[in-house]
Amino acid sequence: MERVSITERPDWREKAHEYGFNFHTMYGEPYWCEDAYYKLTLAQVEKLEEVTAELHQMCLKVVEKVIASDELMTKFRIPKHTWSFVRQSWLTHQPSLYSRLDLAWDGTGEPKLLENNADTPTSLYEAAFFQWIWLEDQLNAGNLPEGSDQFNSLQEKLIDRFVELREQYGFQLLHLTCCRDTVEDRGTIQYLQDCATEAEIATEFLYIDDIGLGEKGQFTDLQDQVISNLFKLYPWEFMLREMFSTKLEDAGVRWLEPAWKSIISNKALLPLLWEMFPNHPNLLPAYFAEDDHPQMEKYVVKPIFSREGANVSIIENGKTIEAAEGPYGEEGMIVQQFHPLPKFGDSYMLIGSWLVNDQPAGIGIREDRALITQDMSRFYPHIFVE
């Protein structure tokens, strides 16, 4: 795997504006970067595909185990009054759309799973669409090796999945929601709306605080239309604790992502994976912080509900060598053996490996100058060659 410098497209900012990529710069710092790209081999892509598929199936085995155990539901911090709702979502095979595994890998040895973003993964639009446009433009300009391709079937698979949701599950109208003042989330929602529209599903967007509760206990939109199918870019760990959580089970909504995803988007997944698949080559040793576990010289402490690296700390010989602030931690912690992210130049690189409908669908690569990848990371495109 190589990081290769390349000339930026002179008009990429205009293209970003034209295509509605409104978060290519965030907080005054570049997010989308194309002064370089990552070059993989076909064998490396096949390895990522194989590992991603296997890890995902292992995660589904965890759901099966947790659903069947009150003790584990408690350990995963699923509120007791929502157990039936979460369990039924799994037992009735509620469909999912997509997820992203974060992997540490430099192209040699085995990729290591750092975490599973199974509920509200972002960086989708730039991985699925904008880096593909970059590939086409740079190929046409003759700036890439002949025969360059990209590990990226995301858009095609998303549209195909929406067609399945319409034909097999009756998704005629899909509401989509996120929080206000979140330009990246809004961009992700807009992209998914476009994919659903391509699949001939009608869509309606509303902000999460605009969702109402009708007289019959059903959720409604601003036009008092009953919400039957809802894609939410809003975490289950919040929803299961809010006032309306008691209404979830009887509201008759088909959720994307389904409630069973609350189990595998949760860092408690990592210790259970290690317990169920000990010494698996793509896993790192991980344990619940409060449980007895082997001492580790260098490890990472992660809150069960942490997002974007918040409240994650790296410990070496009992001392904190790096830490990120945030609002998480009261829910409990897990510890995971430290595994260094590959370093290219002065930045650390993280691979986000995407799945759509349980199938590997491509990657997005982010860089961060800090060891803990946060929401100010930078996205770089990639290619592969045979």
From Swiss-Prot:
Keywords: ATP-binding, Ligase, Magnesium, Metal-binding, Nucleotide-binding
Keyword Heme in annotation: no
Record-marked site positions (Transition state stabilizer): 100
Residues reported in the UniProt entry to bind Mg(2+) 2: 115, 117
Lineage start: Bacteria, Pseudomonadati, Pseudomonadota, Gammaproteobacteria, Enterobacterales
Annotated source species: Escherichia coli (strain K12)
Changes seen on gene knockout: Deletion of this gene does not affect the ability to synthesize glutathionylspermidine. There is no visible differences between wild-type and mutant strain growth in LB media.
Taxonomy, superkingdom: Bacteria
Name recorded for this polypeptide: Putative acid--amine ligase YgiC
UniProt binding sites for Mg(2+) 1: 102, 115
Main function: May be a ligase forming an amide bond. Shows ATPase activity. Despite its similarity to the C-terminal synthetase domain of Gss, is not a glutathionylspermidine (Gsp) synthetase. Cannot synthesize Gsp, glutathione (GSH), or GSH intermediates, from GSH and spermidine, cysteine and glutamate, gamma-glutamylcysteine and spermidine, and gamma-glutamylcysteine and glycine. Does not bind to Gsp.
